[in-house]
């Protein structure tokens, strides 16, 4: 990988990480279309350190409040009823499924899961699920905690059951094409949360798992047998941070007044286009895969 490829892939990562369209799928597809070698799961994980740093900065006040309340709850039992402390505990709970599955399925994540046929399928299927969840969330049910008519839930309503279900939804994102935010936002909408609450919790929930995965995969970058060098990876991570911060701000403003319909149409369209390229022979399912 050279610096130009690193810049392009960092831009793709930053622009798509927080949108429900799957950044890992876009990195895989972009490299295949450009005729570049698949950047691999390790490169994806490391560049996500940049986008998660954007989350840390964007939500710094929320995160500081949650961490402080959680820390106090370790020694003060009464603090465990505090909404921020409970959110901290539930983020930990929700991280367990993807952590366990990520270790168990590591070989599949770095191999078979990156097949472009599987990615095309998950783009379409999860797009339809997101569309169904968004329709369910907006079918005449008011948004807001204080509405007298079946109000949708906000983060203060988060329960142990919901936290675990959020975590299970996040685990699906181990397959490129699913989208971490797409899976968890869909899960949140189906559980009855507002669009804004589902998105904000999705971003918070991703942080421990994504940062841990990125740090773990640092060992795969820049070594003698590594496919990706340090220079392009660092550049890609920085570009992902800058564009990711802008994407968070835009996305949260967008969903406060609009539906996920454009993302649903985009996912389905991209999946169908990818299938047509595969069937027509313009791309092979393992395009860009390293030999061996």
From Swiss-Prot:
Coiled-coil residue windows: none
Membrane topology of this protein: Multi-pass membrane protein
Name the record gives this protein: Undecaprenyl-diphosphatase 2
Gene for this chain: uppP2
The enzyme's E.C. designation: 3.6.1.27
Signal sequence extent: none
Enzyme class: hydrolase
Similarity comment: Belongs to the UppP family.
PANTHER family for this protein: UNDECAPRENYL-DIPHOSPHATASE
Organism: Frankia casuarinae (strain DSM 45818 / CECT 9043 / HFP020203 / CcI3)
Record field: catalytic activity: di-trans,octa-cis-undecaprenyl diphosphate + H2O = di-trans,octa-cis-undecaprenyl phosphate + phosphate + H(+)
Record flagged with keyword Ribonucleoprotein: no
Transmembrane region(s): 89-109, 118-138, 203-223, 232-252, 263-283
């Amino acid at each position: 990988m050279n610096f130009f490829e690193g810049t392009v892939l960092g831009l793709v990562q930053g622009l798509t990480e927080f949108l429900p369209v799957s950044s890992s799928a876009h990195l895989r597809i972009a490299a295949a279309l450009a005729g570049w070698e698949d950047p691999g799961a390790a490169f994806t994980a490391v560049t996500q350190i940049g986008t998660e740093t954007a989350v840390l900065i964007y939500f710094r006040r929320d995160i500081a409040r949650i961490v402080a309340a959680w820390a106090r709850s370790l020694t003060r039992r009464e603090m465990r009823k505090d909404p921020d402390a409970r959110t901290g505990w539930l983020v930990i709970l929700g991280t367990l499924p993807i952590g366990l599955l990520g270790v168990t399925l590591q070989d599949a994540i770095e191999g078979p899961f990156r097949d472009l046929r599987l990615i095309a399928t998950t783009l379409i299927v999860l797009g339809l699920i997101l569309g169904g969840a968004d329709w369910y969330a907006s079918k005449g049910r008011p948004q807001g905690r204080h509405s007298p008519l079946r109000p949708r839930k906000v983060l203060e309503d988060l329960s142990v059951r919901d936290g675990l279900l959020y975590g299970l939804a996040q685990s699906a994102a181990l397959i490129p094409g699913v989208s971490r935010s797409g899976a968890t936002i869909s899960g949140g909408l189906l559980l009855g949360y507002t669009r804004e609450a589902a998105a904000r919790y999705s971003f918070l929930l991703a942080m421990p798992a994504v940062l841990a995965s990125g740090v773990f995969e640092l060992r795969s970058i820049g070594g003698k047998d590594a496919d990706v060098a340090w220079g392009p990876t660092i550049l890609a991570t920085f570009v992902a941070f800058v564009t990711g911060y802008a994407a968070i701000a835009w996305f949260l403003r967008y969903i406060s007044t609009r539906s996920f319909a454009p993302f649903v149409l985009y996912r389905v369209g991209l999946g169908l286009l990818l299938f047509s390229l595969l069937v027509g022979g313009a791309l092979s399912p393992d395009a860009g895969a390293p030999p061996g």
